[in-house]
UniProtKB/Swiss-Prot annotation:
Its EC number is 2.1.1.14. PANTHER family: 5-METHYLTETRAHYDROPTEROYLTRIGLUTAMATE--HOMOCYSTEINE METHYLTRANSFERASE (PTHR30519). It comes from Ralstonia pickettii (strain 12J). Zn(2+) binds at residues 645, 647, 669, 730. This is 5-methyltetrahydropteroyltriglutamate--homocysteine methyltransferase. Pathway: Amino-acid biosynthesis; L-methionine biosynthesis via de novo pathway; L-methionine from L-homocysteine (MetE route): step 1/1. The active site is at residue 698. Belongs to the vitamin-B12 independent methionine synthase family. 5-methyltetrahydropteroyltri-L-glutamate binds at residues 16-19, 112, 519-520, 565, 609.
Length: 776
């Protein structure tokens, strides 16, 4: 009989119970026993959901207090040495020190989990780990297995695989080769598998998503010996799981591994199963056919047509699952109160995806007639979405199709634009500015919430926001900044604010997903063709500009970021949706210009996040992503200055694409790297203007003036001073006014000092500046 299972389930709870329990514990408002009780209740509820839906196993090992990669490290005994903690006795409080840091220890580094919006804690591998035996680590996994078994569940354990674990880790303090630690890692995994066998666990899902990547040969070669060692452990049966992309380029390797089954993601790569034919007669094939990363209902008719031949060929050896862990989607659609019935009928959250698996299984095992009602309901929902006028707008599609090459190019090259912009803006050498947002006080948040509930009339809300804007403008002028912003008091979130004003977007009430630890996000839903019914920011920026003679930046979120931080429709290429958003933003940019706004910032913090996992797919993505930005920005005159902002730790591999965006000014996060990120821009000879951040807004610490002056000196050594701007690393929304004003005062003072050192230099925008810039 066909087996159905899930690779993982959301851990936060339908009402974000884990988030609130964690934050209560961290504040000292509740005990560790209280926190553990919440975790136990959530696990029991989630296992019951899997059982009640008819899954053949419940998945154990997907729960984590903060992050599953950190918990894997704790299980293996791979706690970073610098903390001085005993791996075998690691307490819950100590595990939070690893994740969050304290006065004595910096937190572990955090980065994106493959190409998702989830963040994991990066394991730290140091040379001293070569000389010690790994394990035993903490007992959490075995405790949770016993917990599930005590509730009567049939258990399948999920465990991050050894090669992916090492690949995701970082070598530190001179460790030359992460793979040198493979023997220690395998020793620990062997002990874990043997413990699981003693607990009568039937199956262990070994997650090796690194197999979808372009791996160096040494890493490819490591899979064979590693999984031979796991096989020798005589543990439970092992299901090797790959996801997020095709693993077909490693098909021969995967087929050779001594595992009992393999999971393939057929949502991201539906054709890859052919590369594995003929399937081994003694192995299970698990196919991921329900999308674990998006919120749309599965087209069950299409999936069954695909699976029926596989079911006939494999029989009981066919397993069915989501494409990946359901960690990346909200928990339960039944908790959703904000969406209308039509749109809600197109969606499936984690709990509903379990039900979809059950329908697929019954249709394959008992025949479609056994679930005819469910299949008919699914067909109606799929047809409704396909044919809905809310989804399809002929005018939007026609406008995208009509985009010409000239629509994605500024009227003149940068040097000519720089002349026109300097003539209009008359900026000094090393102009000072900020990234956009200013502190959001409790009063600001309260006014927004009251207005949203209908408790604060529109005119009263407008006046309160105008008062905040006037205060922000006054403070910036008093500080002596050169280019001002309005402060974004009216915005709760840089994507949600615009999404609420664009057609084609919808917002859930409880569509929360975990980003990391206790941080949850509620991505908007792009369900249809996107267009702008009316101006979104013009009146705010126009009012702010009326208060000052200094230039005021308009502030927008770019098309790629609007795309990346949303649940995106899956019925057309992402490029098309990005271009629709770009055209909506283009209209806003042109309206801002017409209202007298001379500088417009189009933020793209998620530009790099969209990079595909496979190198062969990267050029296509970068081409359309940069084009979408240019479409949004290229409708303005030469004397209107276009800014963008990005915050990454690595630019080298995407610098040509960033240059092709052709923003007049790019501001970047550099203070934490001590300006080292600028080296890449210098080596590439980035042609336009750059604003390297000199103040780390993520820290409450206010840097000294001499520190910021030193950072600017370093910046001026790698980028011509004529093209340098001075700014913080990022927006100031989360900081308090006292530290913000102190830091900005320091920025202005450091800038004055640097201007004195370069008194003879000319700003970009004069012929003399072009010559000097070329000579620098």
């Amino acid at each position: 009989m066909t087996t159905i299972h899930t690779l993982g389930y959301p851990r936060i709870g339908a009402q974000r119970e884990l988030k609130f329990a964690l934050e209560s514990f961290w504040k000292g408002a509740s005990s560790e026993d209280d926190l553990r009780a919440t975790g136990s209740a959530l696990r029991a509820r989630h296992w019951a959901a899997q059982r009640d839906a008819g899954l053949d196993f419940v998945t154990v090992g997907d729960f984590a207090w903060y992050d599953q990669v950190q918990q894997t490290a704790a299980l293996l005994g791979a706690v970073p040495t610098r903390y001085g903690f005993d791996p075998a006795q690691l307490t819950l409080a100590q595990s939070f020190v690893l994740a969050r840091g304290n006065a004595d220890h910096a937190a572990m580094e955090m980065t994106k989990w493959f190409d998702t919006n989830y963040h994991y804690l990066v394991p730290e591998l140091t040379p001293d780990l070569l000389d010690r035996q790994w394990g035993p680590g903490t007992e959490w996994l075995f405790d949770e297995v016993r917990e599930a078994q005590a509730l009567g569940h049939r258990v399948k354990v999920v465990l991050l695989g050894p090669i992916t674990f090492l690949h995701l880790a970082k070598a530190r303090h001179g460790l030359a080769d992460k793979l040198a630690l493979l023997p220690q890692v395998l020793q620990a995994y062997t002990a874990v598998l043997q413990r699981l066998a003693a607990l009568k666990v039937e199956w262990v899902q070994i997650d090796e998503p690194a197999l979808v990547l372009d791996l160096p040969q040494a890493w490819v070669d490591a899979f064979g010996p590693a999984h031979q060692a796991l096989a020798a452990a005589k543990g439970p049966k092992r299901l090797l799981a790959t996801y997020f992309e095709a693993a077909s380029h490693h098909a021969a390797l995967i087929q050779s591994l001594p595992v009992d089954g393999v999971h393939l993601d057929l949502v991201r790569a539906p054709d890859q199963v052919a590369a594995f034919a003929p399937w081994s007669a003694d192995k299970v094939l698990s196919v991921g056919v329900v999308d674990g990363r998006n919120i749309w209902r599965t087209d069950l008719t299409r999936v069954l047509a695909h699976l029926t031949p596989l079911a006939q060929a494999l029989g009981d050896r066919l397993w069915i699952a989501p494409s990946c862990s359901l960690l990346h989607v909200p928990v339960d659609l039944s908790a959703e109160t904000k969406l209308d019935d039509e749109l809600k009928g197109w969606l499936a959250f984690a709990r509903q995806k379990l039900d979809e698996l059950a329908v697929i299984k019954r249709a394959l095992v008992e025949g479609p007639a056994a679930v005819q009602g469910e299949l008919d309901d699914n067909r109606i929902a799929i047809a409704s979405r396909t044919q809905s006028r809310r989804v399809h707008n002929a005018g939007v599609k026609k406008r995208v199709a009509a985009i010409r090459a000239a629509d994605a190019v500024r009227a003149a090259p940068y040097p000519a634009r720089a002349d026109a912009q300097q003539a209009r803006l008359n900026l000094p050498l090393l102009p000072t500015t900020t990234i956009g947002s200013f502190p959001q006080t409790p009063e600001i948040r309260r006014a927004r919430a009251q207005h949203k509930r209908g408790d604060l009339p529109a005119l009263d809300y407008l006046q309160r926001m105008r008062t905040e804007i006037a205060d922000v403008v006054r403070r910036q002028e008093a500080l002596g900044l050169d280019m001002l912003v309005h402060g974004e008091a009216e915005r709760n979130d840089m994507v949600e604010y615009f999404g609420e004003l664009l057609w084609g977007y919808a917002f859930t009430a409880n569509g929360w997903v975990q980003s990391y630890g206790s941080r949850c996000v509620k991505p908007p839903v792009i369900y249809g063709d996107v267009y702008r019914p009316e101006a979104m920011t013009v009146e705010w920026s126009k009012y702010a500009q009326s208060l000052t003679s200094k230039p005021m930046k308009g502030m927008l979120t770019g098309p790629v970021t609007m795309l990346q931080w949303s649940f995106v429709r899956d019925d057309q290429p992402r490029e098309q949706t990005a271009l629709q958003i770009a055209l909506a933003l283009r209209d806003e940019v042109c309206d801002l210009e017409a209202a007298g706004i001379a500088a417009i910032q189009i933020d793209e913090p998620a530009f790099r996040e969209g990079l595909p996992l496979r190198a062969s797919d990267v050029p296509t993505y970068l081409e359309w992503a940069a084009r979408a930005f240019r479409v949004s920005a290229s409708g303005v005159r030469n004397d209107t200055q276009i800014h963008t902002h990005m915050c990454y730790s690595e630019f080298n591999d995407i610098l040509p694409a960033i240059a092709s965006m052709d923003a007049d000014v790019i501001t970047i996060e550099t203070s934490r790297s001590n300006m080292e990120l600028l080296d890449a821009f210098a080596e590439f000879a980035y042609p336009n203007e750059i604003g390297p951040g000199v103040y780390d807004i993520h820290s409450p610490r206010v840097p000294r003036v001499d520190e910021m002056e030193s950072l600017l000196d370093k910046a001026a050594q790698v980028v011509p001073v004529q093209r340098l701007w001075v700014n913080p690393d990022c927006g100031l929304k989360t900081r308090g006014w006292p530290e913000v004003e102190a830091a900005l005062q320091g920025i202005v003072e450091a800038t004055h000092r640097l201007r004195a050192k370069h008194a003879n230099a000319k700003r970009a925008g004069s012929k003399a500046a072009h010559v000097e810039g070329e000579m620098a």
